[in-house]
């Protein structure tokens, strides 16, 4: 049996259900398990030593894990952020499939590249999102991050603006698209019931995007739907990036029908 795992501060069963359902459909003798490591270095050593084929990496480990792998694929090296590790006989290669997910969702929703964007966050997922925005042709992007060092560094890297906080909508704190890449709104967190953007920013936006996948409807997504906005959810991000991980681990690309079945199974649980 081949084992794949995920490492996260707050593990969910979504990835586990998605991957395991695909394994079952394809008749693979594989299994996927989710873990919350107490020591990241020891966990990665376990991936190497136990022959674990694949390892998904979630917040807050996407940057810390870089020092623990052997090879950085260009998808991860370009943005210094890792969400996927593939183990080939003890040699660990890091990838980033978050970028692919963001890129595909911007295209799928036909978000105009002239839209102004407020991107809240400056961690590993923010790096993937900023890179996807830049490569898609977005110019008017403001990184909103309390951490001045990481926020300004990210903004400078992609030629964007930086702000330490969100001013009121009538004082510039509005944009055509707002994107949350922080844990605000994540189930189980201290800010699980909080809006990651003020209500007036939601009202002013055309597109409301939250990368938080658990719950499927975060407070921000609920507010966006209620206001009649186009919403892009973390669950959508999770499905696409997990599918690309599956391909990296197995070398198999499931059919659209198989992916839909895995999505439906995941949502039904």
How would you describe each model-predicted region?
Residues 6, 119-120, 143, 210:
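Hydrophobic Val/Ile/Leu positions in short beta-strands of Rossmann-like dinucleotide-binding domains
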Residues 138-158:
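NAD(P)-binding Rossmann-fold cofactor-contacting core
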Residues 2-109, 215-217:
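Phosphate/diphosphate ligand-binding glycine-rich loop within oxidoreductases
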């Amino acid at each position: 049996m081949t084992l794949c795992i995920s490492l996260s501060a707050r593990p969910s069963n979504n990835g586990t259900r998605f991957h395991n359902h695909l394994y079952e459909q394809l008749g693979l003798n594989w299994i996927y398990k989710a873990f919350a490591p107490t020591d990241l270095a020891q966990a990665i050593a376990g991936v190497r030593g136990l022959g674990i084929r694949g390892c998904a990496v979630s917040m807050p480990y996407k940057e810390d894990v870089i020092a623990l792998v052997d090879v950085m694929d260009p998808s991860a090296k370009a943005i210094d952020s890792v969400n996927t590790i593939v183990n080939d006989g003890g040699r660990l290669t890091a990838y980033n499939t978050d970028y692919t997910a963001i890129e595909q969702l911007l295209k799928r929703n036909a978000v105009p590249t002239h839209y102004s964007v407020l991107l809240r966050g400056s961690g590993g997922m923010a790096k993937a999102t900023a890179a996807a925005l830049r490569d898609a042709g977005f110019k008017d992007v403001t990184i909103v991050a309390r951490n001045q060092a990481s926020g300004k560094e990210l903004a400078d890297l992609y030629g964007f603006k930086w702000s330490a906080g969100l001013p009121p909508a009538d004082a510039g704190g509005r944009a055509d698209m707002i994107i949350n890449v922080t844990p605000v709104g994540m189930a189980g967190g201290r800010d699980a019931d909080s809006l990651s953007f003020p209500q007036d920013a939601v009202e002013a936006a055309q597109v409301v995007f939250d990368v938080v996948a658990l719950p499927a409807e975060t407070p921000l997504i609920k507010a966006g739907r209620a206001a009649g906005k186009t919403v892009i959810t973390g669950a959508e991000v999770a499905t696409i990036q997990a599918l690309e991980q599956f391909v990296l681990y197995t070398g198999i690309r499931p059919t659209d029908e198989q992916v839909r079945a895995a999505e439906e199974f995941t949502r039904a649980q």
